[in-house]
Amino acid sequence: MHGFHDVFIQILLLLAISVTVIAIAKLLKEPDSVALVLVGLVLGLTQLPFIEEAESYITQSEVFQATVISLFLPILLGDATLKLPFHHLFSQKKTVMGLAFLGTFISSLTIGAASYFLLDLPLAVAFTFAALMSATDPISVLSIFKSLGVKQKMSTIMEGESLFNDGIAVVLFKIASIYLLTYIEMGWAGLGSGVFMFLKFAVGGALVGLILGYVFSQVIRVYDDYPLEVAFSALLFFGSYFIAEHFHTSGVIAVVVGGFVFGDYGAKIGMSEETKTNLNTFWDSVTLLANALIFLMVGLEIRNIDLAGNWGYIVGAIAIVLVGRTIAVYIGTGWIKELSSKERILINWGGLRGSLSIALALSLPMDFDGREQVLLLTFSVVLFSLIVQGLTLKPVIKKLGLA
């Protein structure tokens, strides 16, 4: 290592590669997230001296986890809340809540039980893996929807589900990886403790987001200065996340709630049209760069994963996750008459997993029993999801006649 300067230059090279890949993918009208993962895989499997140090640096567990969770996640969640009008979300509230709450719990239980009995994973490992697989990533899905002219209804459902189930999945992950075995030993008292822990994370995070969202909404009433208001939005996203985490509640839920309050209530009382336009433009650019690096980093992680001799194990995990998603979608939305069978099929196949799952897996302590198993299975499922499901989503949409 020749110092920070050399690593920084090499990371800029990776960013240049990422942006170039996005530009080419857009010309070819293919999902840029899939293209970035594939290029990352190629870079991770080859030795290129001019970016070797940067690859080694950003694929370290601590760096990847900190970059995705602490830096990029608040940005992506906050931007999504600004882009998703609350009245659109409210119009699909039954479907979004059915998927994000009921569906996420069903998915976690199904995948956890199947992994325990069929893959013979230890109980805590099985349900930790299940929690990771319950978080969905709609980034590539939404870009495909937009390019094909899929109804706004479907984009709202997919994005709304992801915003809420990410927060729930993170809470379930913490409970499964840290407290599950203790709660089981406690019996019924453990069940009560688990429910209390979940409510503490979820409600506490929501309160932090609600308070900060309201405070920043009042602050921007005083100003008509869009650079300053953009800065306030950044403070809200990162402040919500880290304050909630400091008080051991859900930072993800805090950002989502705070972002919705700021983007809906704050926009009504304190943003001019110029501010709204510039706010969206700024975060569009930032999220493009963030996603570019995230998906390239996912591909680069191949250098740290040993797939050899584990193919049966991997195929079993992929099958379990696909079945778990199907069960969750059909039970979670089975009571909703407004949703057609074709739309359910699309929601099912479009439930891609992404970088959050890998980042959370990398955050597991080194002494966590089964850490390598969780990393192997999580990485494999995410790769399958982004590449196979991502590349087949467009033909599926056309076949269903939803374009």
Swiss-Prot record:
InterPro entries, sorted: Cation/H_exchanger_CPA1 (IPR018422), Cation/H_exchanger_TM (IPR006153)
Residue intervals passing through the bilayer: 7-27, 34-54, 99-119, 125-145, 168-188, 196-216, 228-245, 250-272, 282-302, 311-331, 345-365, 373-393
GO molecular function per UniProt: potassium:proton antiporter activity; sodium:proton antiporter activity
Membrane topology field: Multi-pass membrane protein
Main location: membrane
Keyword Transmembrane: yes
Family: Belongs to the monovalent cation:proton antiporter 1 (CPA1) transporter (TC 2.A.36) family.
Known role: Na(+)/H(+) antiporter that extrudes sodium in exchange for external protons. Can also transport lithium.
Protein name, per record: Na(+)/H(+) antiporter NhaH
